């Protein structure tokens, strides 16, 4: 057990200091989990200082560790061994969600470690998963508008250094979030996606699956020299979201404006918040009426196809949670509500349960990952069909990013509305849920509506 009390200090700066500090030294602050949208889901932003230990899984499944000793097994076995709670739950006077632990990235292809029968094509990325042990971080509490420096192990020198860097960053003007110029923008051929939708519908008609989420790619090249922090700031301004993030690790970056939560663990309470059902939003900064918003959301929640897809996926999430929860504890406590973001409306539900005493946070990840809303039902067969139809690795897209606290709590998003960047090259994916009565052209337009929010971060050169 860790016995030295954490150090937590309020710093006289505003929340923009976290983004300024991240932009100044992305290698020193590799992970920024950012509540970039207003609302009840957006309470805390976390900026992680350089890790004291790490576990990395490469694109072929090989493991590398720094300052920890690998145990037999795969990435999740090692994460489970090293991320076990070392502090009692709720053991901080400020009631912060996270005061130290592991920041974790899971690429979509990690699913093959959970379900060995899956043969997924590797993604074009240097790593497929990593976990970073962090003992120092900055926290922005949006409810009170306080910025806090946190040093879990109570190291006074590390704490004073973090406070000084935040104060210095607070003197600077926040980074420029203006759109970035593009030299090139390529979109996957629309006809190919239409054919994939028809093929998925054939699988549904044959009884292989009930629903599948198919995605397509956009590839961009920047005209100017813009690092990941600048790209993230432009994305954040164009498409704010409650589970946004910027990660830079070993020369590769992922930049997310995700609206979706995979799981939240607080004590023994666990929840997942599936999104299924989307409409392009006609009310934007450029114009539109609130009356149009109301009409669009009403049509969305009443549409038979959207309702059927959503109900099917609620059942999938209930079953997944039931694998790690106490019998009879899994409930749907929010049912088919609408959430509106800058460019789309979504149907959202919340499913919660009571985590069994013998189940860890990593056990919960094994049960839920990847999220059913971005695979389909039944999950494993859908993933086999997705791999066959898409023909390429997804990487960060529909993976997950979040944290495992040293008190056992956890919070993970689903990496939708997410860019990956290596130098000037950027890639993004967007998908749509396919069911028996899907209209291929309408599903194509849904992928474009989802991509549009991200593409607003860029302008033609």
Residue ranges, per PLM feature:
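Extended alpha-helical targeting/anchoring segments
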Residues: 1-461
